[in-house]
Amino acid sequence: MATTMTRVSVGVVLFVLLVSLVAVSAARSGPDDVIKLPSQASRFFRPAENDDDSNSGTRWAVLVAGSSGYWNYRHQADICHAYQLLRKGGLKEENIVVFMYDDIANNYENPRPGTIINSPHGKDVYQGVPKDYTGDDVNVDNLFAVILGDKTAVKGGSGKVVDSGPNDHIFIFYSDHGGPGVLGMPTSPYLYANDLNDVLKKKHALGTYKSLVFYLEACESGSIFEGLLPEGLNIYATTASNAEESSWGTYCPGEEPSPPPEYETCLGDLYSVAWMEDSGMHNLQTETLHQQYELVKRRTAPVGYSYGSHVMQYGDVGISKDNLDLYMGTNPANDNFTFADANSLKPPSRVTNQRDADLVHFWEKYRKAPEGSARKTEAQKQVLEAMSHRLHIDNSVILVGKILFGISRGPEVLNKVRSAGQPLVDDWNCLKNQVRAFERHCGSLSQYGIKHMRSFANICNAGIQMEQMEEAASQACTTLPTGPWSSLNRGFSA
């Protein structure tokens, strides 16, 4: 009897810990809960591509899944789906570069070994995807070398790069976790916004593309380009969220539509499946980037629902007059399906905050596992470790702020949001150094902890010196965490 009561108690505790963090209720809400989309002035400064040689260049694509772990299934599913879409559109394999850790399809947790799906009734999208850069070869240095077409700088992998010319069109799709000013990677360090924008500027200076389109799925993804991506580079970027909000996982357990019952993880991301499911059903010679942007924006923050994020656009917005086929090609099977200014794909009834999708997986795994099984014990451990890590990081950052700025002023300084159009931080090297100082004493931020990047940026913007940060971090964290979250094991985020 005592054992039974203990198991029930553990289950109740885990459920209480998770209930406020996992899938967001998406029953239709009242007017006060509706997300109001910001009005955006049209900045169509660039004429549409109507010249005779607009289609004479080669189409290139770079697809990046920036995470690892079965609980992050959806990111690699997004990338594999995008690859299949581009191949059906006519892009050659030699012109598509794929980055993915490749630990999902044959993972022991995968109920359909050797396959990956991106929607509840979707077909396998894994078969045929080239393994250009996998495992530890999925890193910032290789990504930058690939974008710049620098074969000599690539280490490992297939060696494939974007060997583009002045008339070529490039499409980049990145799906992962993010935080203010940073994108995750399955390796260390993470990808920082200033470095990415510097590489895009170098690519423009090389004169090796005509136009470049960047689709970005991540939390706070607007912060990657806001105040950093100038006009005049012939680059158009859209992001799943603005600079200060989460993006959303979809096709998760308990949602409608739900994944097949044997799956215990989210299959896709809301922004990503929105643009891909739209592209997969239309003749892309009849649909512009701007039309897709508007459609994806409506599906990602549907009117009358309490969930969603604000899809944003940056850079040379005039490029959005281009037809999608200039970057993605078009599937001949869709020739008769021209774009209609309405979304036939209904928004899901519920979605899951990107940062909580791992908890959804751990809870589903725990809930379904037989009592007394090794699987249930493993899931219980994963939930408790994840929750403990979150509490440690949150409390440590808050305490650092109070030590540096005082008990009452600390939270105010850490949470300050700069006005629209400004970059996250003035000194990016300062940001990286402050992050390293924190991680030396408090452990790895991880995919969850990068939500606090704005706090570290504000510490820099307030003029705090490295010595002060080192002292504050050492006071906040008297012992370095061990186990999976130690910076000794994971390396540094910066």
UniProtKB/Swiss-Prot annotation:
GO terms for molecular function: cysteine-type endopeptidase activity; endopeptidase activity. Disruption phenotype: No macroscopic phenotype, probably due to functional redundancy. In plants lacking all vacuolar-processing enzyme isozymes (e.g. alpha, beta, gamma and delta) shift of storage protein accumulation from normally processed polypeptides to a finite number of prominent alternatively processed polypeptides cleaved at sites other than the conserved Asn residues targeted by VPE. Auto-catalytic activation. Residues 1-29 form the signal peptide. GO terms for biological process: leaf senescence; proteolysis involved in protein catabolic process; response to ethylene; response to jasmonic acid; response to salicylic acid; response to wounding; vacuolar protein processing. It is found in: Vacuole; Lytic vacuole. Its EC number is 3.4.22.34. Glycans are attached at residue 336. Induction: By senescence, wounding, jasmonic acid (JA), ethylene and salicylic acid (SA). Disulfide bonds join 252-266, 430-460, 442-477. CDD domains: legumain_C. Specific to vegetative organs, especially in senescent tissues. Also expressed in seeds and root tips. GO terms for cellular component: lytic vacuole; protein storage vacuole. The active site is at 177, 219 (nucleophile). InterPro entries: AE (IPR043577), Legum_prodom (IPR048501), Legumain_prodom_sf (IPR046427), Peptidase_C13 (IPR001096). The record marks 266 as: Required for post-translational maturation and enzyme activity. Keywords: Disulfide bond, Glycoprotein, Hydrolase, Protease, Signal, Thiol protease, Vacuole. The keyword Flavoprotein does not apply. It catalyses: Hydrolysis of proteins and small molecule substrates at -Asn-|-Xaa- bonds. PANTHER family: HEMOGLOBINASE FAMILY MEMBER (PTHR12000), VACUOLAR-PROCESSING ENZYME GAMMA-ISOZYME (PTHR12000:SF50). Belongs to the peptidase C13 family. Asparagine-specific endopeptidase involved in the processing of vacuolar seed protein precursors into the mature forms. Probably involved in post-translational proteolysis of seed storage proteins in the protein storage vacuole of developing seeds. This is Vacuolar-processing enzyme gamma-isozyme. It comes from Arabidopsis thaliana (Mouse-ear cress).
